[in-house]
């Protein structure tokens, strides 16, 4: 808690007015002289993306292919300084990325970053580099007038208020997958009833959901988008699918429309499932709240 106590993240004992965005970040960067003296920062580009890909494949839970990484992180909506690579000489020691998104938060529209790919090489995990990287990406976001960030963690931070905690599952036993692709009115994604959800322009919708990196299942104006990747499970690399977006209008998506090996949250179960040990806890940076109903899917 020593790091988070000085950060603008909602605390369990926070007694100020709820539903208020903090516009001023405390000027207390994480004091890591080791990091300052021994590391240098670069940003992801075509020149270092192969090194980045190898680093993630070695150190990150999900095993993305190179084209998917390029599509996710070198997208036309995010700034290059949202993809931070921390080098010790010529070796990547840690990374963090932020994908620029737009959210509806209590019916008001804000830009934010979806923070992901926070990854530290195992040789450096006792140096608290993740705190330094979080400070760096929030500093860069603020320079572009973005102060809200969303992120998942498998850690429940002491005395920090989280949006939601999810069990995770892998589905199995579906040998008759049907990829249903009826017309879907994307504007329905922008009209959800929850307090917090992503919204999209037509350009963003086409970029994120009209490609070979996701499986889109649409039926009778129900919509699920699943990000394709791989994961090491029981010493085997298997293909999995992670929910990126979902709009369930009437629960009439048939179980055979859902792929095998789907990392799926507890609010939408299908087929036979294996409950994983890991949980996902979602947080919001720079926003104080009491309860916050949401329809966001982070990875």
UniProtKB/Swiss-Prot annotation:
Coiled-coil ranges (or none): none
Keyword Nucleotidyltransferase attached: no
Keywords: Acyltransferase, Transferase
EC number(s) reported in the record: 2.3.1.97
SUPFAM superfamilies according to UniProt: Acyl-CoA N-acyltransferases (Nat) (SSF55729)
InterPro entries according to UniProt: Acyl_CoA_acyltransferase (IPR016181), NMT (IPR000903), NMT_N (IPR022676)
Superkingdom as given in the UniProt entry: Viruses
Enzyme class, UniProt record, top EC level: transferase
Disulfide bonds: none
UniProt GO molecular function: glycylpeptide N-tetradecanoyltransferase activity
Catalysis: reaction(s): N-terminal glycyl-[protein] + tetradecanoyl-CoA = N-tetradecanoylglycyl-[protein] + CoA + H(+)
Gene3D superfamilies: 3.40.630.30
Pfam families, sorted: NMT (PF01233)
PANTHER family from the UniProt entry: GLYCYLPEPTIDE N-TETRADECANOYLTRANSFERASE, N-MYRISTOYL TRANSFERASE
Family: Belongs to the NMT family.
Primary role: Adds a myristoyl group to the N-terminal glycine residue of certain proteins.
Entry protein name: Putative glycylpeptide N-tetradecanoyltransferase
Upper classification of the organism: Viruses, Varidnaviria, Bamfordvirae, Nucleocytoviricota, Pokkesviricetes
